[in-house]
């Protein structure tokens, strides 16, 4: 309904929280797409997949008005890059874990788009004022020390856009440090 591209994969958070966000609709769905959307929201017979109050975004900088509406409508937590720099990885991690204290399992999805555009060349949507590699490593390593973390993924690495394999190497370094911390726990 709201993704500017019109592609169903442009609304993963909306699908996860079971939200059509029709009040911000920019597309009319044909019957086939509507059925696919409903199937996607109900995959696994779990609906919604996650509660909006259990979502935290870190270093979210560039989003469409439709996404902003969804975040504000549901009061989803957003921590800016400036907050990470001002408060440090340990304090941000502590704040997030305290906010999610009622959750039994925490899924960490690291989108390389959250890195600053000066280093995130191998992704489809690089944006300035993002996190530095070391800041991400510190944040992820702090999260990985918590036993509630049940899954960790790295998304949006696009090798066809990468320059000299830099993005892949950064993602690998972050993954390697995360795995090392998991092995120590």
Language model: regions and residue ranges:
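Exposed alpha-helical structural elements
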Residues: 12, 35-39, 66, 95
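Short acidic/polar capping segments at secondary-structure boundaries
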Residues: 3, 18-21, 60-64, 84
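Conserved catalytic alpha/beta core of Sir2/sirtuin-type deacylases, generalized to analogous enzyme cores
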Residues: 11, 50-52, 57-63, 71-73, ...
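Active-site histidine-anchored catalytic micro-motif
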Residues: 1-36, 146-149
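Alpha-helix-centered segments that form part of catalytic cores
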Residues: 34-59
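Solvent-exposed alpha-helices and their adjacent loops that cap or buttress functional pockets
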Residues: 6, 46-50, 100
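Short glycine-rich loop/turn motifs that provide flexible caps or phosphate-binding loops at active sites
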Residues: 5, 9, 17, 58, ...
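Catalytic cores of soluble, metal-dependent hydrolases
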Residues: 65-185
């Amino acid at each position: 309904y709201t993704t500017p591209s019109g592609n169903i994969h442009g609304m993963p958070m909306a699908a996860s929280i079971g939200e059509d966000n029709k009040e911000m609709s920019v597309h009319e769905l044909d019957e086939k797409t509507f059925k696919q959307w409903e199937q996607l929201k109900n995959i696994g017979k779990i609906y919604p997949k996650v509660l909006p109050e259990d979502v935290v975004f870190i270093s979210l900088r560039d989003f469409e008005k439709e996404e902003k509406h969804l975040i504000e409508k549901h009061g989803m937590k957003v921590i800016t890059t400036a907050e990470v720099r001002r408060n440090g990885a340990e304090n941000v991690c502590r704040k997030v874990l305290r906010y999610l204290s009622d959750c039994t399992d925490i899924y960490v999805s690291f989108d390389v788009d959250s890195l600053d555009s000066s280093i995130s060349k191998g992704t489809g949507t690089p944006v300035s004022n993002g996190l530095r590699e070391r800041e991400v490593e510190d944040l992820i390593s702090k999260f990985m020390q918590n036993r509630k973390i049940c899954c960790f993924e790295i998304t949006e690495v696009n090798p066809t856009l990468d320059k000299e394999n830099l993005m892949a190497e950064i993602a690998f370094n972050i993954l390697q440090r995360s795995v090392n911390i998991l092995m120590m726990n």
